[in-house]
Amino acid sequence: MAKKVTGIVKLALNAGKATPAPPVGPALGQHGVNIVMFCKEYNARTADKTGLVIPVEISVYEDRSFSFILKTPPASVLIVKAAGLNKGSGEPNIKKIGSITTKQLESIAETKLPDLNTNNLSQAMKIVGGTAKNMGILIED
C-alpha cells in the first residue's frame, strides 16, 4: 500500500546551499521531517547546478519520511543569467536594461519546457519571451 501524504512543501533554494536555517528549517520542522537529511540530499542532487535557484516540491508522508522533486530554475533567473545582469529593470516599460538573443531564448525555453503547460517549443519561447519583456530585457535576432 502507498504511503499517505500528509503535506506538500514548495521551496525555492539556492542549488547546493540548503541549510537547516530559515526558510528550510521552519517549513519542514512543522511537518516533523528530518531537516538535516533533506539538506544533505538536496545539496547532493543540486551540486552540479550551483549559482541557480532550484525550486523543490517536498512530499511529506505520515511516517515523517519524505520525497522531493526538483523543478527547473525560474525563467527570470535563467534570463538574468543569459543577459549577464544582476536583476531585472525596476521600470520595464520605460527602462530597458539588457538583451538576449533568440538562440538564448530558445535554450531557456528548452530548459523550462518540462515545467510549462505546453509541449510546443515556439509556445514556450513566447512564454519565456513575455517574462523577459516584463523584466525590461529585449530579444534580438
Swiss-Prot record:
Keyword Ribonucleoprotein: yes
Localization terms from the record: Plastid, Chloroplast
GO cellular component terms attached to this protein's record: chloroplast; cytosolic large ribosomal subunit
SMART domains: RL11
Highest taxon above the source species: Eukaryota
Entry keyword rRNA-binding: yes
GO biological processes: translation
Main localization, broad class: plastid
Classification via InterPro entries: Ribosomal_uL11, Ribosomal_uL11_bac-typ, Ribosomal_uL11_C, Ribosomal_uL11_C_sf, Ribosomal_uL11_CS, Ribosomal_uL11_N, Ribosomal_uL11_N_sf
GO molecular function, one term: large ribosomal subunit rRNA binding
Pfam families the record matches: Ribosomal_L11 (PF00298), Ribosomal_L11_N (PF03946)
Alphabetical UniProt keywords: Chloroplast, Plastid, Ribonucleoprotein, Ribosomal protein, RNA-binding, rRNA-binding
Known partners and oligomeric status: Part of the ribosomal stalk of the 50S ribosomal subunit. Interacts with L10 and the large rRNA to form the base of the stalk. L10 forms an elongated spine to which L12 dimers bind in a sequential fashion forming a multimeric L10(L12)X complex.
Family according to the record: Belongs to the universal ribosomal protein uL11 family.
Biological role: Forms part of the ribosomal stalk which helps the ribosome interact with GTP-bound translation factors.
Name recorded for this polypeptide: Large ribosomal subunit protein uL11c
Species the sequence originates in: Porphyra purpurea
Gene field: rpl11
